[in-house]
């Protein structure tokens, strides 16, 4: 909301609620139609979509477009975590509870590290006075937040590459 210069109430309602609604719709949709859709295709779409939405939210000068991108990010990421559990359980059907514990710990670590590094980039852009160098409109804080969001687009790309590797491994096992 600060990065897009929106009032707090409007930002909370549109951003958090929109993200949550789209997250729920994505998971519900996969629950209904998942038997007809490859989880790897869903995760590829989700990774590419999340990356695109992060970039759109970061570079959009229009607050409405930025908020729409934040909401649609919820749809894009909705199946990334559950999808990783589906892929792991199909690849290692006898792994048991320890696999899910490791996946949970890895997911928590990834969520924490992603937020941490995004915050580092945001703080560095603001502290080093790079906002005027970057030439974006807005306050130094807004430019720094947008820069951090732009940096965060790398994480869904990492998810995409891992998913493509796992898909290739699954195809080799099937042949």
Each predicted region: which residue ranges?
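Helix-to-loop junctions at the C-terminal end of transmembrane segments
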Residues: 26-38, 122
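Intracellular juxtamembrane helix-capping segments at the cytosolic ends
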Residues: 79-92
């Amino acid at each position: 909301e600060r990065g897009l210069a929106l009032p707090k109430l409007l930002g909370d309602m549109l951003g958090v609620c929109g993200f949550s609604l789209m997250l729920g719709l994505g998971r519900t949709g996969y629950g209904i139609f998942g038997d007809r859709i490859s989880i790897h295709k869903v995760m590829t779409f989700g990774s590419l979509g999340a990356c695109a939405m992060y970039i759109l939210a970061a570079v959009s000068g229009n607050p409405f477009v930025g908020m729409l991108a934040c909401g649609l990010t919820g749809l894009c990421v909705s199946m990334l975590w559950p999808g990783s559990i589906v892929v792991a359980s199909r690849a290692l059907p006898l792994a048991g509870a320890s696999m899910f514990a490791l996946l949970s710990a890895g997911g928590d670590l990834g969520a924490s590290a992603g937020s941490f590094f995004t915050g580092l980039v945001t703080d560095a852009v603001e502290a080093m006075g790079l906002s005027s160098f970057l030439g974006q409109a807005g306050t130094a804080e807004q430019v720094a937040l947008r820069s951090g969001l732009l940096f965060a687009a790398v994480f869904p790309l990492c998810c995409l590459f891992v998913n493509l590797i796992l898909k290739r491994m699954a195809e080799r096992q099937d042949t």
